[in-house]
UniProtKB/Swiss-Prot annotation:
Alphabetical list of SMART domains matching this protein: EFP (SM01185), Elong-fact-P_C (SM00841)
Similarity comment: Belongs to the elongation factor P family.
Primary localization class, coarse: cytoplasm
A Pfam family of this chain: EFP_N
SUPFAM superfamilies the UniProt entry points to: Nucleic acid-binding proteins, Translation proteins SH3-like domain
MF (Gene Ontology): translation elongation factor activity
Entry protein name: Elongation factor P
Compartments where located: Cytoplasm
Keyword Disulfide bond tagged: no
Taxonomic lineage: Bacteria, Pseudomonadati, Pseudomonadota, Gammaproteobacteria, Enterobacterales
Domain of life of the native organism: Bacteria
Length: 188
């Protein structure tokens, strides 16, 4: 398996640390005036989701993680597993609640998602950056009621709650940024 030296660290690189695959979020290579150079790294463990800050000497090397990102289409949820399909081979994969996590509220049938696999098992699911969802419940926006923040909570058809502008009504379809969970626009 490939190894990376500390000067090859960059954001998004997947490495093995303590027997668990991790993704590097930030990497800073430091050359002090006196002493040995080192790399200061922020890491997210892909299975547990924990954030770590770790320092590596410039002479250290780490093993690359044997993880694979695949673009798959979300099919359905059977109550226990979320099912995805590879559009080229039509092979289906099932991800459990631990792999899907909080992203379940952004999964829409037929949406292209990124599944991260480790040893053939899904360890994380990344929904598309933007999804279009229907509003199932929100307070009515009264004309002239613009005092305050100018927003109201709205429940979407997946169960997610998003802050939307006052003019948005029940039954309308809106575009939501899944990375921040914020309203982007109305869909015509």
């Amino acid at each position: 398996m490939a190894t990376y030296s500390t000067n090859e660290f960059r954001s998004g690189l997947k490495i093995m640390l303590d027997g668990e695959p991790c993704a590097i979020l930030e990497s800073e290579f430091v050359k002090p005036g006196k002493g040995q150079a080192f790399a200061r790294v922020r890491i997210r463990k892909l299975i547990s989701g924990k954030l770590l800050e770790k320092t590596f000497k410039s002479t250290d090397s780490v093993e690359s993680a044997d993880v694979m990102d695949m673009n798959l289409t979300y099919l359905y949820n059977d109550g226990e597993f979320w099912h995805f399909m590879n559009n080229e081979t039509f092979e289906q994969l099932a991800a459990d609640e631990k792999a899907v996590g909080d992203n379940a509220k952004w999964l829409v049938e037929q949406a292209e998602c990124i599944l991260t696999l480790w040893n053939g098992q899904p360890i994380s699911v990344t929904p598309p950056n933007f999804v279009e969802l229907e509003i199932t419940d929100t307070d009515p926006g009264l004309k002239g009621d613009t005092a305050g923040t100018g927003g109201k909570p709205a429940t979407l058809n997946t169960g997610a709650v998003v802050k939307v502008p006052l003019f948005v009504q029940i039954g309308e379809v809106i575009k939501v940024d899944t990375r921040s969970g914020e309203y982007v626009s109305r869909v015509k």
